Amino acid sequence: ALPISPFLVTSADTYLDFDLGRLPKKLPSGMLGLLVMTNNPPHHPDGDYSPDENSILRLDGDKLTYTGTGMLHPDLVRDVPDSVFMLRKVFDEAVNAGKFLAIEHDGVWCDVGTESRLSQLRKMLDQSA
């Protein structure tokens, strides 16, 4: 069952030092999501979405990378007929409709989806300890 209010999502294969307190208590009226975006890493140089001057995400322009963390309104997925689906497709539709906002993160972020990137993150964290 879906919650009645926006909820936090975060990918299990990412690491970031983002302060979740920066997220709003609720989404602005009509918005279906807010994604935490960061500079593009070497393995994803083209990014995902481009924030405009009002932080509304667009499919064109200078793109940033989605960190895997954000807030989603349950209406975003409420009517998706499939029990298993790609969030990217749902995100693209909402972005195309101007219903997603961005908040930029310039701190540490790492996609640890490969052994190599996980190893690099572990080395970085060990050095900073």
Per-region residue spans from a language model:
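Short beta-strand-to-loop element that shapes/binds the nucleotide-sugar donor at the catalytic cleft/hinge
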Residues: 34-48
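Short catalytic-loop micro-motif centered on adjacent basic/acidic residues
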Residues: 9-11, 35
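Short, Asp-centered acidic motifs that coordinate Mg2+ and/or phosphate
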Residues: 6, 32-33
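Catalytic-core segments of class I nucleotidyltransferases/pyrophosphorylases
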Residues: 7-8, 15, 20-28, 40-43, ...
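Hydrophobic/aromatic residues located in beta-strands of well-ordered beta-sheets
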Residues: 33-34, 100
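Short acidic-glycine loop/turn motifs at beta-strand connectors
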Residues: 50-55
